[in-house]
Amino acid sequence: MSEKPRHAPLVQFPVVDDELTIGGLKLRHLAAQIGQTPFYAYDREAMTRRVRELREALPERISIHYAMKANPMPAVVDHMAGLVDGLDVASLGELRVALDSGTAAAEISFAGPGKGDTELRGAVAAGITLNLESAGELERLVRIGEDLGITPRVAVRVNPDFELKSSGMKMSGGPKPFGIDAEQVPAVLRRIGESGAHFRGFHIFSGSQNLRPDSLIEAQDATFELAYRLA
């Protein structure tokens, strides 16, 4: 009896003549071209195909954004920028790569806790959308906007009061370092209105590492219900 495979077959990287291939090229030949190992190799066609498959599975009105924390390599970002509707960054370094890709500032968002004043200042100056992680971050952002003479663009990252069931990484359903607790959001929204900042919407993320359709549908329903309740 043959041993059960430990992972799903890598159909995007087929084996030809007992050699793994990427982008139709054998790894041995790639290594010879590059002249050294180890190295990173990416298949643009595979990325294009996966984004296309995702678009075909979603309603047309849904926008797809690429989170650069997945892979901020400039060549990868440049290719993805031509496939998706926007980019999400988590540092000034990623922001520079995103802007260099030609993506419009209006289609770039900045998420993540612990943003320093240097990061907030750079994001406001660039004109991108900042996902607020706390009421204190909003106050710092307002002061920076006044200093630069630029009206900040903001979204509110909400820590939901529900969780994505069977999730490998839970980002909701209790105290978390990400986002503002749902019950505190109304006060933050009032302060945004008073400050004159441009409100762009909500960032609601309940978890990841979950491919169960029933859990995802339940979480999406709860997400829309929460957004309607807060709006």
Range-by-range predicted roles:
Residues K115-G122, R157-K165:
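Short, basic, helix/turn surface patches
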